[in-house]
Amino acid sequence: MADQVKERTLEETSTWAVAVVCFVLLFISIVLEHSIHKIGTWFKKKHKQALFEALEKVKAELMLLGFISLLLTIGQTPISNICISQKVASTMHPCSAAEEAKKYGKKDAGKKDDGDGDKPGRRLLLELAESYIHRRSLATKGYDKCAEKGKVAFVSAYGIHQLHIFIFVLAVVHVVYCIVTYAFGKIKMRTWKSWEEETKTIEYQYSNDPERFRFARDTSFGRRHLNFWSKTRVTLWIVCFFRQFFGSVTKVDYLALRHGFIMAHFAPGNESRFDFRKYIQRSLEKDFKTVVEISPVIWFVAVLFLLTNSYGLRSYLWLPFIPLVVILIVGTKLEVIITKLGLRIQEKGDVVRGAPVVQPGDDLFWFGKPRFILFLIHLVLFTNAFQLAFFAWSTYEFNLNNCFHESTADVVIRLVVGAVVQILCSYVTLPLYALVTQMGSKMKPTVFNDRVATALKKWHHTAKNETKHGRHSGSNTPFSSRPTTPTHGSSPIHLLHNFNNRSVENYPSSPSPRYSGHGHHEHQFWDPESQHQEAETSTHHSLAHESSEPVLASVELPPIRTSKSLRDFSFKK
């Protein structure tokens, strides 16, 4: 009979067939590995450290998939040999009993086999289906050991094989989906470049002259947000809900939030020198590393989604709408935060001087954590990717008409809602998130570019080693006079917030122009986006001082007194 036909082993297989399969698998694997390595090299060459770290996360996900694949392959036979009763196995199926009987030739649950009532055609169909499944299974002997005991396998060998494919499809679709969303969001944010360049024009500086006094409601930012609907919570959320669909990020909002960020974190006079758009791009690249990763919490959510595919739960009516509802709430919340920033301006007074200054703060965000919004966006992207991956996998395995898609409406709902969520994430929520989350109480480490950040980390690491080994003196003499400490060019003291407010008495008289006259005013803020040529000029200038007057040049580094002073500066990820 057909169900007694067993698959051939390697002893019965041609060696050339085995060699061809191994060659193809190795060739594809080597090409993929080499491609990933080339992409990583390109990211390093372009100084895209955040994207390189995101690529490392993708490689970690691929390694995790390799472990899952190995475990499924090894545990396929032991798992399929676990037997459970037919009563337990008949619960929570994707198909109804009638659908299973029609599709697989199984009798309805609860009916006993009387031997005469079963139609010969149905019996033949059952035998054909079972033999087909056994032929396609991996590492099976072609028969079900549990059937001999009158029981059912916990998960059949072929079922594990199908699950194996789905997990791989889910991971790949999630990564691709995140990349597409990030790319579309970057395209949407290209318009910000012209806004950023406008801040360096004379017209912008004149219109925002600090000597000008205006009513808060008469400013462009005030006219957009200070209205009657912003006085009550209900009308505020309703208006912000619809506002996200029509110009979620406007020029007025961008310029106001940019000005507030710079005034909160930098010394006055640096507004035209700081590139806020590039800072947002670096922050978004770093957040992309988190989004592209499938964390244990996200894997747990995937398991819950698999559980909801039981017949009777009708998951197709509510599961696709979860990411849609969440992303709409997140977008509304981000719009509400912008409006509340405007209301804070009015609370300080009806008259503003120059450009309106918004006051950032973590209290504007849920639970006082701006990163919580990133988690919700991560959850939305994964949920939507899960819907797409599950649809593609189930269609490939069981055709379009299957138990997971009970009707055409199910397919339409999944695809339409998935497309809507994709558009909202890319063109509405992601640009809003990138801008509004900068309004927290603290600025992110990405305020420095990769070159400056690397110098800061090296300086901090060297300073910690000096303190740890007790190589500094207890006086105010700076430790930088020692040859192993960072030089003037790598000292980050002039990068720190409120540096201009520190007492100049801690720094003895120095020939450096930074602490005298016009030079001090000009270099009070080291522009992270300065050109490489300027950095080289500064480096050569400091080397000249070190060669001629090493003692005086070393005075420009901050002193290290105790380990507590080191904790005042940290560069954590």
From Swiss-Prot:
Keywords: Calmodulin-binding, Membrane, Pathogenesis-related protein, Phosphoprotein, Plant defense, Transmembrane, Transmembrane helix. One of its GO terms (cellular component) is plasmodesma. Residues 1-15, 83-164, 309-317, 393-415 are extracellular. Residues 450-471 are annotated as: Calmodulin-binding. Residues 522-548 have a biased composition (Basic and acidic residues). Pfam families: Mlo. The modification Phosphoserine is found at residue 512. Residues 473-490, 498-513 have a biased composition (Polar residues). May be involved in modulation of pathogen defense and leaf cell death. Activity seems to be regulated by Ca(2+)-dependent calmodulin binding and seems not to require heterotrimeric G proteins. Belongs to the MLO family. This is MLO-like protein 2. It comes from Arabidopsis thaliana. The lineage of its organism: Eukaryota, Viridiplantae, Streptophyta, Embryophyta, Tracheophyta.
